[in-house]
Amino acid sequence: MALRFPRFSQGLAQDPTTRRIWFGIATAHDFESHDDITEERLYQNIFASHFGQLAIIFLWTSGNLFHVAWQGNFESWVQDPLHVRPIAHTIWDPHFGQPAVEAFTRGGALGPVNIAYSGVYQWWYTIGLRTNEDLYTGALFLLFISAISLVGGWLHLQPKWKPSVSWFKNAESRLNHHLSGLFGVSSLAWAGHLVHVAIPGSRGEYVRWNNFLDVLPYPQGLGPLFTGQWNLYAQNPDSSSHLFGTSQGAGTAILTLLGGFHPQTQSLWLTDIAHHHLAIAFIFLVAGHMYRTNFGIGHSIKDLLEAHIPPGGRLGRGHKGLYDTINNSIHFQLGLALASLGVITSLVAQHMYSLPAYAFIAQDFTTQAALYTHHQYIAGFIMTGAFAHGAIFFIRDYNPQQNEDNVLARMLDHKEAIISHLSWASLFLGFHTLGLYVHNDVMLAFGTPEKQILIEPIFAQWIQSAHGKTSYGFDVLLSSTNGPAFNAGQSLWLPGWLNAINENRNSLFLTIGPGDFLVHHAIALGLHTTTLILVKGALDARGSKLMPDKKDFGYSFPCDGPGRGGTCDISAWDAFYLAVFWMLNTIGWVTFYWHWKHITLWQGNVSQFNESSTYLMGWLRDYLWLNSSQLINGYNPFGMNSLSVWAWMFLFGHLVWATGFMFLISWRGYWQELIETLAWAHERTPLANLIRWRDKPVALSIVQARLVGLAHFSVGYIFTYAAFLIASTSGKFG
């Protein structure tokens, strides 16, 4: 018999039903469950797949560069970044009639094009790229790196080049390599690029390989470095009248601590950014030499963890046993990595708009909105994944004997207290926030807006004041003009910071009021509820009072039959499944808030947000309904316009989202009966019955149907909001 899919599971390959296909796809990446898997092969497969991942990333970025160079308008955008619309690529569509061709021909293009809302133009411009040739060179280089990555992945699966398990479990060497080799060296290289190419580029000096060694980024070269006069590198920074990309108003400094933004580009000073990367490089290069490898000096992670026993016995045996637990569990390591990456991605979202690093990106409002929303959604998925793999760790890898009375065991011992406290916090936030919104809503409906309960966020305003925001009149710390910190800030450190906080042309420390207070608590409710579901799923993954032997059933199981009464929907997978809905819900509130506040800020009618955000109808009418007008105007009696594609995507997103409910609010028997009826009809229909299939069609399992439903719900939800966001923002601001 020929080998059937899936080859990694002979048991599944012999399944006579369509379950073979779906279960095969579902477990393709669960290497641990495959036939003939060994620990060594498991590590090697994962290691090789990392190279494939890198190859895809480099190919994708290469494609961005290539298509902009080939079909974009980078060179004309560089001449006038504020008024030329950046083109991502052309659109070739045989269905386009003349109105469509006219609607999508913009940005100085000859035919229909897509506008870039990803910020790549601003990024490439800031780092010193100026011509299409530069973009082609970058694309070719990344293509080369992509090919090298593929070869690397293949190579590390060959017998001679397969690393051993001990190599994968050498934590100290890996830490040193990642800290120094990846973070340290790459940050140093980036600081070097900024100093040698980007900063001269911002001052009108075009540095390439042919003149790289002739152009000194600083007049005195390395002199100040070797004579210890490092402060010279910060002297004579660009002036406030500097025109980016020209020598007009340019200085000579390369490493500064100015703070604030370049007045023309409204982005961080390039010299500040270079300084930051140099500092990061220094820290990580040092950190990468701290762990004990060949020479018997430095820290041993195991020794560090074994020594971490808090005095007073409050945390039992502290970190004892953690080293082997973490080092031998890929799921634990992945959970930690995902948790860190998720937090970082959310921080990227917050900082890309409040402290924009790329020239002119702050004035490209649609790009700002798209990047914020994109990074928050990515962060949500990554963070929920962290808890999913934490739960799998508890089911597959956790050994109670190895972890007796350490912090992990104590988390499990205290899980009732942890879960009930989170539950209490969620209930408190939910009822109080909704209560305030509903009360205010009713007051507005009855025509007595003055009876709303409006709470000023005085503590948050005080924190903003402490950082230098003067408009609240708190007169504290950095907002107190006669305090020592304020005076030192004028000259010693970040003199531009206080100006930036107090001018209205950026998104630093936006003025907040009762509407912000309410929506912050709504978001807090979402965060706490999502966390509650995820934490409970992980802590109850091994067992609960209702089902003490849960771990024997694995990560995802539908029920344990009627005999156990009520064991449905309590697998760790079900907790993840439920949490994703809450995560999407929460990020919906976060992005609604961010977008509405910024739209009113950019349009100069902040009072609309302030007045309408304190009650539910305000959000529904003045944010969602008012801003969706562009989406229902994509096609009208006058034909179509450049928003038509978003209008179509808005409808399509709703369709995909609604399809999700077909899988979510349904039972397996219904589908099985329907499938059998269809199969019966098929087999009795002339011509149709000439086509036979090998596998008996069966309905999806309960867990699979939930996954399919969740996938449609998530994709439709994000498509719908993406279309709304881009159309409503670009419709107003271009």
UniProtKB/Swiss-Prot annotation:
The keyword Iron applies. One of its GO terms (biological process) is photosynthesis. The chain crosses the membrane at residues 46-69, 135-158, 175-199, 273-291, 330-353, 369-395, 417-439, 517-535, 575-596, 643-665, 707-727. GO terms for cellular component: chloroplast thylakoid membrane; photosystem I. It comes from the Eukaryota. One of its GO terms (molecular function) is 4 iron, 4 sulfur cluster binding. Its EC number is 1.97.1.12. InterPro entries: PSI_PsaA/B (IPR001280), PSI_PsaA/B_CS (IPR020586), PSI_PsaA/B_sf (IPR036408), PSI_PsaB (IPR006244). [4Fe-4S] cluster binds at residues 559, 568. It is a multi-pass membrane protein. Its main location: plastid. P700 is a chlorophyll a/chlorophyll a' dimer, A0 is one or more chlorophyll a, A1 is one or both phylloquinones and FX is a shared 4Fe-4S iron-sulfur center. Pfam families: PsaA_PsaB (PF00223). Phylloquinone binds at residue 671. Chlorophyll a B3 binds at residues 662, 670. It catalyses: reduced [plastocyanin] + hnu + oxidized [2Fe-2S]-[ferredoxin] = oxidized [plastocyanin] + reduced [2Fe-2S]-[ferredoxin]. The PsaA/B heterodimer binds the P700 chlorophyll special pair and subsequent electron acceptors. PSI consists of a core antenna complex that captures photons, and an electron transfer chain that converts photonic excitation into a charge separation. The eukaryotic PSI reaction center is composed of at least 11 subunits. PsaA and PsaB bind P700, the primary electron donor of photosystem I (PSI), as well as the electron acceptors A0, A1 and FX. PSI is a plastocyanin-ferredoxin oxidoreductase, converting photonic excitation into a charge separation, which transfers an electron from the donor P700 chlorophyll pair to the spectroscopically characterized acceptors A0, A1, FX, FA and FB in turn. Oxidized P700 is reduced on the lumenal side of the thylakoid membrane by plastocyanin. Belongs to the PsaA/PsaB family. HAMAP family: PSI_PsaB. This is Photosystem I P700 chlorophyll a apoprotein A2. The gene is psaB.
